[in-house]
Amino acid sequence: MDKFTSLTGVAAPLKITNVDTDMLIPKQYLKTIKRTGLGSGLFAELRYREDGSENPDFVLNKPAYRKASILVAGDNFGCGSSREHAPWALLDFGIRCVIATSFADIFYNNCFKNGILPIVVSPEELEKLMDDAERGANATLSIDLDAQEIRGPDGGRIRFEIDPFRKHCLLNGLDDIGLTLEKGVHIDAHEQKIEGRRSWL
């Protein structure tokens, strides 16, 4: 998993509440267990028309937001089923941070496991960030994970909270496998100890 220390990028405003995982990545894209290639299916029912052409009115299809790496969204983001394809699709598209007033628990946890930073802010702070994001090409936000700050284009700063363990994992690029490998020396020592006691294994 790639480390997340800081991020400066275009923020796309998604003024939709209760964005569920089916909206994030529709069921027809769930046939794969690969984490790559899902970016094209992100928000597919909103991004594409019935004939397969792009919907020019959807925010991520607008020229200013095609390279967005931050998503500023509405309340209860990521609700619905537990499909891990949802954060996979966000990551494959290039989204590394989602800012909202609340997240569904399973989606929130899955974000951390896949190197995405979900940030919870107050309604007032979200309104300010939405205004910043609507500046289009100038909609650049900076995220400093170590300082736990969002910095706007006007120099304003918003502090956010994050669990220390999750912060440690993101800063060091540690997913579940990485956390296990951190204990590799202890695991090897345990295996050798067990092998000596249970030679028949």
Curated annotation (Swiss-Prot):
GO MF annotation: an example: 3-isopropylmalate dehydratase activity
EC number: 4.2.1.33
Keyword Amino-acid biosynthesis listed: yes
Broad class of enzyme this protein falls into: lyase
Reaction catalysed by this enzyme: (2R,3S)-3-isopropylmalate = (2S)-2-isopropylmalate
Function: Catalyzes the isomerization between 2-isopropylmalate and 3-isopropylmalate, via the formation of 2-isopropylmaleate.
Family as reported in the entry's similarity comment: Belongs to the LeuD family. LeuD type 1 subfamily.
HAMAP family (UniProt xref): LeuD_type1
Protein name per Swiss-Prot or TrEMBL: 3-isopropylmalate dehydratase small subunit
Organism this protein belongs to: Methylocella silvestris (strain DSM 15510 / CIP 108128 / LMG 27833 / NCIMB 13906 / BL2)
Species classification: Bacteria, Pseudomonadati, Pseudomonadota, Alphaproteobacteria, Hyphomicrobiales
